[in-house]
């Protein structure tokens, strides 16, 4: 089973234990072993941190799904991209639509979608949460747990 994530750029540190316990439940009780996470904002960073920790204890795989090809500056790129992937076909998408394309791709792959959405106004996270619900994905909202 596959899980992906959408959340606001700014998130309180207090949700990290809830995120961790939610992921452990998905791994232990719902056979989730593959995770796709973006690389934009605080929620994504928190998810990556927790997944890295859990990957040391559980047989799981996670990938950071990029919206753009990484750019090299000065000819040398010291960044390790071994845990990243690009969605198939994204190279043909105009840059201004790349994040939306990436997010839709992540939803299509997922069985579960974990979100942290506390407001809808101008929120891409809220938009993609609604899309996941419309595609009948199992959506777990962390904002109101605990």
At which residue positions do the language-model features occur?
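Acidic/glycine-enriched connector segments
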Residues: 2, 9-146
């Amino acid at each position: 089973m596959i899980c992906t994530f959408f959340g606001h750029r700014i998130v309180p540190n207090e949700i990290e234990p809830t995120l961790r316990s939610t992921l452990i439940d998905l791994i232990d009780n719902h056979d989730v072993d593959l995770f796709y996470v973006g690389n934009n904002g605080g929620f994504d960073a928190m998810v990556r941190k927790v997944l890295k920790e859990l990957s040391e204890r559980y047989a799981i795989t996670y990938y950071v799904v990029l919206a753009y090809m990484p750019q090299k500056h000065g000819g040398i790129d010291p960044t390790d991209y071994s845990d990243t992937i690009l969605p198939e076909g994204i190279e043909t998408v105009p840059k201004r639509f790349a994040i939306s394309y990436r997010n839709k791709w992540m939803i299509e792959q997922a069985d579960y979608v974990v979100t942290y959405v506390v407001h809808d106004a101008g929120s891409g996270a809220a938009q993609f949460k609604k899309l996941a619900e419309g595609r009948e994905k199992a959506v777990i909202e962390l904002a109101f747990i605990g």
